Amino acid sequence: FVYSGNFLAEVEVDQIEQTRMVMGIHPTQFSYQLKQGEVFDAPEVVMSYSGEGFSKLSNTFHKAYRNHLCRGKYKLSRRPILINNWEATYFQFDEEKLFQIAKEAKELGVEMFVMDDGWFGKREDDTSGLGDWFVNEKKIKGGLGKLVERINQMGMKFGIWFEPEAVSEDSELYRAHPDWCLAILNRKPNRSRYELILDMARADVREYLFQAMCEVLDSANIEYVKWDMNRNLSDVWSAYFPKDRQGEIY
């Protein structure tokens, strides 16, 4: 399913042994209002079939994505070998610790260093900082550009971690805009992983994330983004939309 939202895939065999496959937007919690003359473009679906087992099915599917859906210079070329600092450091790092990890990895033939969670805002553990997409210069002294330049000078590419849809209640973003989160009226929110989910139905939320991420990505020679999503959607209710349009959110 060429779509990142809630979807349904079904396969059934009827009484005369006909097999039917159906895939599309999941009907649960979905509705979409169309005024006269408006059009709704449903997401595309890619299906793969093989009579030669799962291996052939998987190979056919991979080829379809590489040849027709992937874009950019890595569409058909080998991806760089990368190292990620997450389990080596968790949130406890500074630019020197990151540089040393990259330096040792370079000696082993690794081609890219990816800086994971903890580089932004007041992010000392998983209870704070999400949503504040600006560099923590107590950890990355001199800013992101200086660190990336050092990594590049070793002959390595640089990547960075984001989790754009999530926000911590202990963050500058949440304190400024508590109404930007999905939340069901008069109910306590689900704080899975100490996170809430931003309401992407709001244009101001999308604009904030776009501008904040662009500012980071434009500040240095960043060639890769690890785009994480660590919790499921819940409390799917937008204060921005009226009651009869809540089915457009999920």
Language-model regions, residue ranges each:
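Catalytic cores of glycan-processing enzymes that make or break glycosidic bonds
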Residues: 1, 17, 29-30, 34, ...
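N-terminal accessory beta-strand-rich subdomains and adjacent acidic, glycine-rich linkers
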Residues: 1-65
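Short, solvent-exposed beta-strand-terminating loops
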Residues: 2-4, 168-170, 176, 228
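Hydrophobic faces of well-ordered beta-strands that scaffold small-molecule active sites
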Residues: 42, 79-85, 111-115, 158-162, ...
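Long, charged amphipathic helices and adjacent flexible linkers at domain junctions
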Residues: 61-81
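Flexible hinge/switch segments at interdomain interfaces of large molecular machines
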Residues: 72-77, 121-122, 182-189
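Aromatic- and glycine-enriched glycan-recognition loops and surfaces
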Residues: 89-175, 182, 207-211
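Active-site neighborhood of glycoside hydrolase catalytic domains
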Residues: 136-154, 174-250
